[in-house]
UniProtKB/Swiss-Prot annotation:
Function text: Catalyzes the conversion of dethiobiotin (DTB) to biotin by the insertion of a sulfur atom into dethiobiotin via a radical-based mechanism.
Recorded superkingdom: Bacteria
Pathway involvement of the protein, from the record: Cofactor biosynthesis; biotin biosynthesis; biotin from 7,8-diaminononanoate: step 2/2
Keyword 4Fe-4S set for record: yes
UniProt cross-references to InterPro entries, sorted A to Z: Aldolase_TIM, BATS_dom, Biotin_synth/BioAB, Biotin_synthase, Elp3/MiaA/NifB-like_rSAM, rSAM
Domain called Radical SAM core: residue spans: 1-230
Protein name (Swiss-Prot/TrEMBL): Biotin synthase
Keyword Iron tagged: yes
Keywords attached to this entry: 2Fe-2S, 4Fe-4S, Biotin biosynthesis, Iron, Iron-sulfur, Metal-binding, S-adenosyl-L-methionine, Transferase
Single GO biological process annotation from the record: biotin biosynthetic process
Subunit: Homodimer.
UniProt: [2Fe-2S] cluster binding residues: 62, 97, 223
């Protein structure tokens, strides 16, 4: 039986408005990166992106905002989008990724049609102060606990290649395993010249070993998803991610960087004799 690959697409419903100082993120207003910046994307455009993603095999669609966490205005905006998408595309699993959130806020999202919430730990508790000083790692962990307690599907992972040590990688993965996420997104840092952070880049072999390590250390996760940085990190060795434990990818564009055309990803999977998942377990 062929391995089935779960496809997900993400939509930046507001962009580049965050006041936090995460050193790896071009969406912070502090770094003045050359990216699109807008407060709210039109719902008609979001619906079109969701329809395109679903028609290309995506079962997950993530609504991403660029602030530290949910406030009333953002919560209402995400809920209004979810209500439209739930009606138009009932088979599409709606995911929210809106930063720190209380249980009450998460329950409101759930009532609007959101099924899952993505909040990454990013790195280890020990290393986090070196990449962000405006909020704590503990706040991130608490939000993940809130997601579980609100009855939403937890999606939580991190980003490799920030200059972290091997011990930090192991520490983060242990913390993630304690939260029992359904899906673990793995991102690989892509340097933007506007950002302060400029560590030595990972090798392809090192990145593949990190996918394998993630699968080994979080054995109960249904999906290990290779997300941001996939094309740039792996190049013509991209197909090797699946043999090393990945069974999910993000298709289409990322938040502030371009991905491959969706059709090219589908062609890659077909060439590897890998089927696209047709249902959410």
């Amino acid at each position: 039986m062929n391995q089935k690959i779960f496809l997900c697409s993400i939509c930046n419903i507001n962009s580049g408005t965050c006041n936090e100082d995460c050193k790896f993120c071009s969406q912070s207003v502090r770094y003045k990166a050359d990216i699109d910046r807008y407060k709210q994307k039109e719902i008609s455009l979001i619906l079109k992106e969701a329809q395109d993603a679903y028609s290309n095999g995506a079962l997950g669609f993530c609504l991403v905002t660029s602030d530290k966490g949910l406030n009333d205005k953002t919560l209402n905006f995400v809920c209004s989008i979810a209500e439209v998408l739930s009606k138009e595309l009932p088979e599409l699993r709606l995911i929210a990724c809106n930063g720190t959130a209380t249980i009450e806020q998460l329950l409101t999202l759930r009532a609007s049609g959101i099924k899952a919430y993505n909040h990454n730990l990013e790195t280890s508790r020990e290393f986090y102060p070196k990449i962000c000083t405006t909020h704590s790692w503990d706040e991130r962990y608490e939000t993940c606990q809130n997601i579980n307690n609100a009855g939403l599907v937890l999606i939580s992972g991190g980003i490799f290649g920030l200059g972290e040590r091997e011990e930090d990688r192991v520490s983060m993965l242990k913390s993630l395993d304690s939260l029992k996420p359904t899906s673990v997104p793995i991102n690989f840092y892509h340097h933007n010249e506007a950002l302060e952070l400029s560590p030595n880049p990972l090798s392809v072999d090192e990145a593949l070993s990190l996918i394998k390590l993630t699968r080994a250390m979080i054995p109960d996760a249904q999906r290990i998803m290779v997300a941001g940085g996939r094309e740039l990190m792996f190049g013509d060795r991209e197909s090797e991610i699946f043999a090393n434990g990945a069974n999910s990818i993000v298709i289409g564009n990322y938040l502030t960087t371009s991905g491959k055309a969706m059709q090219r990803d589908l062609e890659m999977l077909k060439s590897l004799n890998l089927d696209v998942a047709s249902s959410v377990k």
